[in-house]
Amino acid sequence: MTRRELFTAAGSAALLSPLMEAAPAEAVPNPRGHLGMGGAPAGFGAWNAAHASPGGGRGRGAGSRPFLEGFFDYCHSLGLGVAEAGTPPTNPDDVHRLRDKMASYDMWVIFDVGVPRDEADVERFDAGVKAAKEAGGYGLHAALTQRRYEQFNTLADYQKSFEQNQKSVALAEPILRKYQMRLALENHKGWGAVEQAAWLKRLSSEWVGVHFDFGNNVSFLEDPMFTLETLKPWIFSCHIKDMTVQPYDQGFLLSEVPLGDGFLDLKKMVDTLRAKNPNMPMDLECITREPLQIPIYTDKYWVTFGEMPPRQVAHMMEIIQKNPPKKQVPHTAGLDPAARLKEEEDNNIASIRYARAHLGL
């Protein structure tokens, strides 16, 4: 299937036709099949733009993206072995076609089924998990939060949101157990590693764990290895990425960069996770965008955190000082759609090649 056919099948050829000619994808051979590196939609901005649905998206509970069969095909065309592909299909023909593709491509799929908001929403969640099971999903992913330091103005507001997250997952757990489907909760700039670990320890369910993002908790002044080690007992799956940090007047700028271009010890992190589970899905999420502002010198940043260990803060300041960007970090402001897609694909292909050569992915 060609790149044009992929976009057409996804219903977005008219929107993206100028981009397809400007930035052709380049497949990277995948010798590991479903054990090779996968793809997360946030790292593929053209797909996010083409398939955004009103009220959907990450961090919105029940609002999840519709099934992205085109993205599943696109990941295969790039040499990726796993795809995070929205909500599961329910039409029997679509389910059979997906199962056939998973077998022929030797790929896995991870679905997003929004957790129940309340008791009245459990029936919808049950139907979604059942559909994911019937479609052959490896598991479920959920990102329940936005950026905590931007979203909330008081500690009480954050605590109310966290309580709702815990209630939703508690409602979801019996359904997950019923269908024996695992739900992996992403550390999505909402909870610190210690908070998330304590919650999962209290929940004590083999069906609820972590979708570990390699870089998100840098925004909480956490060393990525600390985050990994703290959450490791519960990690089911991952978003692999590399990060750079650089100072600005209100704190530091945080950017995803191609694998190998940042300060993360990727080999150590991958080896640690492979030792836990040699078959763990690791999905590439190199988001090509403007650097994120982490305003640690403002009162607004700290209002939801309470006390943070001084040594933790000092360690992150040392990382910022000693790890300037190795290359120009991605910037997208002012780029036309074709140039943005070209930069994104270049970054993703570079990351896939690095993962093949240096990480065994």
Name each model feature, range by range.
Residues M1-F7:
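Twin-arginine (Tat) signal peptide motif
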Residues F7-G11, P18, E26-G55, G70-D73, ...:
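Histidine-acidic metal/acid-base catalytic patches
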Residues P18-L19, T90, K101-I110, P116-G209:
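Active-site acidic/histidine proton-transfer and metal-coordination neighborhood
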Residues L35-F44, A83-A85, V109-V113, L140-A142, ...:
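Hydrophobic faces of well-ordered beta-strands that scaffold small-molecule active sites
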Residues A40-P66, D112-V122, Q159:
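Active-site mouth loops of central-metabolism enzymes
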Residues G57-Y74, D121-K130, F220-T227:
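Short, acidic/polar
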Residues P66-P89, G136:
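Catalytic domains of carbohydrate-active enzymes, especially glycoside hydrolases
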Residues A85-V95, V115-E123, E150, N187-V194, ...:
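Acidic-and-aromatic substrate-binding clefts and catalytic sites of carbohydrate-active enzymes
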